[in-house]
Amino acid sequence: MQHQEQIDISLWTEHYDMDKITDALLEAECQTPLILGISHINISSDGTKISITYEDDVKTYQKKQKEVEQKVSEIISSLISEGMSELEKELVIHKYMCEHISYDGEALENAKMNQMKKADKVYRDSFTAYGALINGKAVCAGYAGAFKLLADKAGLENIIVTGSLEGGLSHEWNKVNIDGAWYVVDVTNNDTQFYPNALLNLSDQAAASVLVEDKRYVIDDNIEKYSADNIEQEYYFTMGKYYDMNQIAEKIVKELQTKDIVNVRTDYMMTDEQFETIMEEVEKEMGEEKLGAGYWLGVIRVERKDAK
């Protein structure tokens, strides 16, 4: 974190094999978002030293770190007040990020052009918490790093998780401990107007069709400690907008009487056929009203197309 270019690990190599040392090194890199951009890490052939190459010179690196730390303190001071529950803290942090950070699609496309191994200099900040918190734009790594720093400052136990999106594109998200239970939170994919907060406090099972974990983010032996098996604090459930499939059409119709756009949730494993059945019921009740609708991970969005 202090821009060290050489780290002596000889004391550890005497007691641990290289697999465990590599595992620990990967965890340290993943879970320390104040490390603002590493271009290369190498372990010496004799296993006694780690060499690190940074994207920025030491002066720039330290300046960016200071800016991030100051911004984190400023944000948390404005958001968190005494007596807030852990869930309340998480939700205000999450809301702040969705309102103040935009996804940097250009940075992602640039990384794709480089086989996802690097990005051109102009885009590199977007892969860090600096891009998210200072520049206001980032890709998933920046979102995940920013969430960790803010949640840490607010006193919430949390981690960054690495893996892929639907088994393809590399992706990063978070898990957070709320009242003793771990939950999946993906601010990047929640920052959308179509299916907002679809990945806010899900279980591993509910998120598994979209978020595929690898083992890079934490020491392998500890992965099970972060299992998310609970949905009590799932966003739509806590907001009173989660309904059984046999009730949801009625609820959508009721909300459409006073709203132009409705977002509600039902079973995460809802199929296309089940969604079509629900919408047939809604359209039958709405008569001639023209509707647009879609779903993702059980979140249904219905919009009145004729609304002015």
Would you name each region that the model predicts?
Residues 141-207:
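Hydrophobic/aromatic-rich core segments of domains that either
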Residues 68, 89, 139, 143, ...:
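Hydrophobic (often cysteine-bearing) scaffold residues that line and stabilize catalytic clefts
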Residues 63, 135-138, 162-165:
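Alpha-helix capping and helix-loop boundary segments enriched in small/acidic/polar residues
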Residues 57-132:
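Secondary-structure boundary elements
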Residues 129-143:
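A short, highly charged nucleic-acid-interacting micro-segment common to nuclease
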Residues 1-77, 253-258, 263-268, 272-308:
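Linear, non-domain "peripheral" regions
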Residues 114-118, 127, 138, 149, ...:
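Extracytoplasmic/periplasmic C-terminal soluble domains
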Residues 181-278, 292:
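His-Asp-centered catalytic microenvironments across diverse enzyme cores
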